Amino acid sequence: MTSKLDQLREITTVVADTGDIEAVARLKPVDCTTNPSIVLKALGTPMFADAIKEAVAWGKKQGGNPDAVSSAVADRLAISVGAALVKLVPGRVSTEVDADLSFDTEASLAKARSIIAAYKDRGIDRDRILIKLASTWEGIRAAEVLQKEGIDCNLTLLFSKAQAIACADAKVFLISPFVGRILDWYKKSTGKDYTAEEDPGVISVREIYNYYKANDIKTIVMGASFRNAGEIEALAGCDRLTISPALLDELSKDDGKLERKLSPESRKPDAKVSVDEKTFRWMMNEDAMATEKLAEGIRAFAKDLTTLRTMVQKELQLAAA
């Protein structure tokens, strides 16, 4: 029998949401996605011990403000994780712009360009990388500019149709609408359990997928943030799905039949609209779940980024002793 993972690969591009080199080599995804949490976890493994030593040695040679040096070394380490993953996948690796820049378009642009330049220094072309930005108004504006420069973007922490519409208006390459974190919010809010078909996160991604296909929007829809295999199965046929190694393993061991749930041919009419800034902010204001989960996600990624920079500072201090 063919596993559900292999059946899924026939209709959806499978992406691994991890920095685990061993898991990527074993599971053979097309792409990989990373974020500050994933980078931090990867750097805690022996695989990246030499990369940490190299980055710290590089940092020691840099002059200037210690905080700026720590930040630069942290960036270098994130690129090291991404560069290792690029060697293992035929497609792209997503590297995230600092979460604490989520409300600063110009700073996000500068950081994105520096990420692309850092990869180029390692012989990795921009067509192997996706720049991840939070789906704030400012992040979407940065992506709009980057796309015109030939730098493809992955808009993350996306919880609402308003964000998806704004991303479509900006002609971004790919969006990552979240599933599991939406479910978390509704379970906490209502105290209910949900089947996969009732799952508010699944319903959200299906609505966004349908809107894009109904209006011939070329932006790729990549469902993200899964709590269980049922959510993944309920989105079978989505353009791409980025999945943790644990859930990829679960799907690889299940020989049941996988039914396609999404396809461009099954789209229903959904009138195309555009959003300006005030409309976007109002729609977000009216969506408590999207507002809260976006803010929470930015805070969590910023916290992990701070943890990484603190680790770097300690390593630099030890190296200087």
UniProtKB/Swiss-Prot annotation:
Gene: tal
Complex and partners: Homodimer.
Record's subcellular location: Cytoplasm
GO terms for MF: transaldolase activity
A biological-process GO annotation: pentose-phosphate shunt
EC number: 2.2.1.2
GO cellular component, one term: cytosol
The protein's name: Transaldolase
Record-linked Pfam families: TAL_FSA (PF00923)
Classification lineage: Bacteria, Pseudomonadati, Pseudomonadota, Alphaproteobacteria, Hyphomicrobiales
The family this protein is said to belong to: Belongs to the transaldolase family. Type 1 subfamily.
Pathway it works in: Carbohydrate degradation; pentose phosphate pathway; D-glyceraldehyde 3-phosphate and beta-D-fructose 6-phosphate from D-ribose 5-phosphate and D-xylulose 5-phosphate (non-oxidative stage): step 2/3
SUPFAM superfamilies: Aldolase
